[in-house]
Amino acid sequence: MAERANLVFHNKVIDGTAIKRLISRLIDHFGMAYTSHILDQVKTLGFQQATATSISLGIDDLLTIPSKGWLVQDAEQQSWILEKHHHYGNVHAVEKLRQSIEIWYATSEYLRQEMNPNFRMTDPFNPVHMMSFSGARGNASQVHQLVGMRGLMSDPQGQMIDLPIQSNLREGLSLTEYIISCYGARKGVVDTAVRTSDAGYLTRRLVEVVQHIVVRRTDCGTIRGISVSPRNKNRMMSERIFIQTLIGRVLADDIYIGSRCVAFRNQDLGIGLVNRLITFGTQSISIRTPFTCRSTSWICRLCYGRSPTHGDLVELGEAVGIIAGQSIGEPGTQLTLRTFHTGGVFTGGTAEHVRAPYNGKIKFNEDLVHPTRTRHGHPAFLCYIDLSVIIESEDIIHSVTIPPKSFLLVQNDQYVESEQVIAEIREGTYTFHFKERVRKYIYSDSEGEMHWSTDVSHAPEFTYSNVHLLPKTSHLWILSGGSCGSSLILFSIHKDQDQMNIPFLSAERKSISSLSVNNDQTSQKFFSSDFADKKKLGISYYSELNGNLGTSHYNFIYSAIFQENSDLLAKRRRNRFLIPFQSIQEQEKEFIPHSGISVEIPINGIFRRNSIFAFFDDPRYRRKSSGILKYGALKADSIIQKEDMIEYRGVQKFKTKYEMKVDRFFFIPEEVHILPESSAIMVQNYSIIGVDTRLTLNIRSQVGGLIRVERKKKRVELKIFSGDIHFPDKTDKISRHSGILIPPGRGKTNSKESKKFKNWIYVQRITPTKKKFFVLVRPVATYEIADSINLATLFPQDLFREKDNIQLRVFNYILYGNGKPTRGIADTSIQLVRTCLVLNWDQDNKNSALEAVRAFFVEVSTKGLIRDFIRIGLVKSHISYIRKRKNSPDSGFISADHMNPFYPISPKAGILQQSLRQNRGTIRMFLNRNKESQSLLILSSSNCFRMGPFNHVKYHNVINQSIKKNTLITIKNSSGPLGTATQISNFYSFLPLLTYNQISLIKYLQLDNFKYIFQVINSYLIDENGRIFNLDPYSNVVLNPFKLNWYFLHQNYHHNYCEETSTIISLGQFFCENVCIAKKEPHLKSGQVLIVQRDSVVIRSAKPYLATPGAKVHGHYREILYEGDTLVTFIYEKSRSGDITQGLPKVEQVLEVRSIDSISLNLEKRIKGWNKCITRILGIPWGFLIGAELTIVQSRISLVNKIQKVYRSQGVQIHNRHIEIIVRQITSKVLVSEEGMSNVFLPGELIGLLRAERTGRALEEAICYRAVLLGITRASLNTQSFISEASFQETARVLAKAALRGRIDWLKGLKENVVLGGVIPAGTGFNKGLVHCSRQHTNILLEKKTKNLALFEGDMRDILFYHREFCESSISKSDFSRI
């Protein structure tokens, strides 16, 4: 009893960690055998007590946490609010995903933390509780899924599914939850199988690399070492890692404290000695590692250190290589199995929050913060430095310090309540997480037209790319609408939101019904239409009997009508308007059908002075063959053509074009073929061939002549010069000139022959060699530049307003410079001369300040016949940013940003409705083909039509009869609407004006039978200055919604609607949903304001998408998008899951040296830098030796640290020496380079570094090489044993190469002997005589080389030391002997 009283009694819970410590102490005190007996007693005790207390596990023991209900309800409420914010466009998809995942993760984690206290209070002897929290079986995550909630799951690709599983396994899963659960569990099961096989294959490759590494000697005699220091410049090494690195190593140098030696060289380090060294505060300790051993085919006992099994120095003959490979590969398999039961459940981290301790007012320095968005899309302030936040209450002042890079979630002087979150601290950068960049694609939910916000300056990455980067946070809008899917429409050239008259154009139209909508004051009728295919024909279109209001937008270019030229539409040149016509000189046969006048209008519609308005490519100046242009430039007038590529980018200058005052130019034809570099050319340079000669496998020559082959970058130019070859003598004058044109009649005269040329010729001197030359006389095509078609007469005289005084000048210019080659691609022709029309105006009059001309197209549809009009007028200034544009009343137009660009003229049942335009001025027919009718139609600001003058008698009579019948019609003369800009509010009322004009469709520039009915416009016009013009105070018009693309705001009870909202609502403005625009008003749906009437607003439905800086927008402005099209790509970073399933591929990438991160890139850069610098400093022989050595040391340390970082982040502890043995093998080769090569090695050959050094010394000449990093697979296939290589992979290839090269396998490794059935050269009793012999051999060599060793004890030692992180290495050039 007395002995029992002296025993120490420990009253504490024994968990897994405590058991480990207990077993460790028992082994230290009693030894292995006695400890095993004690542990058997503990095991028996446990079974007996479990049986005595009758612990069993039943389904009733799974108790759900009571607080789960309201926690889940609170998370659902937050998710609903988040969904609303996303719908309103306040957060984008990535922020929504992040926040949703964190909401549910926080809920799940809170439930998990509640489990333990709940069990302790309600049922402390619950079997689940005791089993899980004692560590006997099951962990907290598994119990949490049983009694808490399963939470968020991963899909097979590893992405989070933002729909959580709210049930636990006790409650049972719904069908949806079960399917999602299968996703995650499938990921766990599949990952387990796949990663287990991956880890097994990794182990096989590792063992393959190092299977021949066996402990052969006690001491290799190296003087090198690696210095380990607990304190480094960059960071502090933890004491635990420092001790782990030192224990079991052997010292490379003596350690002195002052003058006293406390440890000797070649002494192994135990825990006692290491603790003493730490206590003494030793700065750096030099230790021996496998890196410092002097051979790559074996290792010595002292460089390896203690054996991890029994704690003494490793025995001779120990196969440490295989142990190292299995030590690295095995944890991958082991840790993969750990994730099996968890089944893909998401585990992540949330940010730390700072909460207010009590109610009060916030105070902080606003100069130290910067406004930003959190990763959840909330507004916040970012702190750059430590920020002091003061919370003032009535009697207490509390100060909180917010660390840098944190988010402050409150404003200055804001009142906060107790426990309110005021700041969010980001996760510390010291934690090791695998970050990966993920692309999140956002797809369009509906069909429509793309807009981005008006205040976003937008610049594309590439000029012609449809991917654009957003510079700041903004909204993208998809304006609702549909595409017309009928293939029977005659001219499908509607673009950029043209008004389409679907009932007229659609061949599937069934009927026209009439709707009636009752309002308080009046009853209106609306037209609607039924379609067979409603999904496809939902075009944004509306129509009303009383007239409607469309506003023109200048940013839209309308295509003209084509007959046979529909293929030109495929070029997507939306700013080009082609006027097809036949030859004026009645030469239809000679003209190509695609010829015509091209009018190119910049996207913003602005022409500068002296800019090209239209051009015409004359078919007479077209060539199909390549050649060279020659002409004499007498005088050049510069015509600068400017265009705005994108309206926000300002004016971009294009290439200067020159009008050449020449009457003729010359074209020297030649056949040119541009071939890839690898083409097999079947003709020789400077050879002469005939017609239809095979040049390559697929190309034959079109003409015969002299071959010229020119090799350029990655391509070959093959030219064929036709002509006569002349070998001149010394007296021949023609031989003195090269590259000249000789006019006809001139000839060459000499003693032998005389010849005169009928046409112009081109003389070219060819010099195949330095001594020989000959002259090639080539034919020349001569072109006379005559007066071409007078393009100005094709435009009507009243195209411009009379007071603007705009003129059109005609120029001809040559498209290619003098002596420049022209190249034709495939079968396309080359245009040599272009005729252009240049806009000019007089600057001497009162409008001298005018700088630009404004031009745009208008498309009018009448009875299915589409007509194009152009309008041109001067403007005083041009500002590229639209929202800031101010226009004077006399500028000729009013631009409205983002306005509905419809110009609806909608014919239905013989009635064509006219809608007023906001643009003042004149819109007129663009081109008249028939000279008898100068202008057919003019639409002016006063809404009056001027018909005529018609020279044809029949047309003239019809108009006169119409005027007689309707005497109240106002018809102005030609000077009226052209010269006046009437006020917007001055509208004319017309009685019906009937005009009959019988013209066929074939001529397509004249009007068919139609009838105009003008009605009084009953709408408000709001211009950009906020002025409201009441067009008709007595009407109350509501437009009919068509296909649910429009929303209407009725105002029946609020009389001051326009007064209150005139400063808020403007035409073209975008509204997010739930925005209140007036008092007592319903909240609007999201969309764009199209029409503001007296008591109603027409809004086009739109869906907003928020995009943040750096997001990539796909598509162009105002492009039509279909449902499912990619809209935006977000690129964001996320943390990978924290299990070994993600860490194992990382280890594999590092060991295979194909890492996707910066390891291999940095090492490659360092390798090149060291090779260059060291070679330059020390000269070539020293440079290659030291450069390669330092690079290898550097890369070895970097790789070891990287691999250890991965394993330590997973909680796996592997001794450094195992990794060092592997890394030593993959970094011990050098690549022989080509420069200064000796005859021993081939360029590109992989050899060992030691072999390269010894060969260099033996040959007494420099061998140029550089260090390379081999992956473990390549290292396995580059060993000294071809039997080992063949047993790994690619057996046939390896054996065939070995047979051809006559390789000899000395059977030094383990695997070769296993394959051949021999005794493996390993084991503690294997062949000691061989080891003894080699030791004597080494000693002799070392005695011979003592002079070389002394070299490194002097000044050179400082150069050879290289410091990197916590390691230091010195390199010796002593002789390295090998077995």
Curated annotation (Swiss-Prot):
It is found in: Plastid, Chloroplast. Binds 1 Zn(2+) ion per subunit. Its cofactor is Zn(2+). It comes from the Eukaryota. Keywords: Chloroplast, DNA-directed RNA polymerase, Metal-binding, Nucleotidyltransferase, Plastid, Transcription, Transferase, Zinc. GO terms for cellular component: chloroplast; DNA-directed RNA polymerase complex; mitochondrion. One of its GO terms (molecular function) is zinc ion binding. Zn(2+) binds at residues 220, 293, 300, 303. GO terms for biological process: DNA-templated transcription. Its EC number is 2.7.7.6. It catalyses: RNA(n) + a ribonucleoside 5'-triphosphate = RNA(n+1) + diphosphate. DNA-dependent RNA polymerase catalyzes the transcription of DNA into RNA using the four ribonucleoside triphosphates as substrates. HAMAP family: RNApol_bact_RpoC2. In plastids the minimal PEP RNA polymerase catalytic core is composed of four subunits: alpha, beta, beta', and beta''. When a (nuclear-encoded) sigma factor is associated with the core the holoenzyme is formed, which can initiate transcription. Belongs to the RNA polymerase beta' chain family. RpoC2 subfamily. This is DNA-directed RNA polymerase subunit beta''. The lineage of its organism: Eukaryota, Viridiplantae, Streptophyta, Embryophyta, Tracheophyta. The gene is rpoC2.
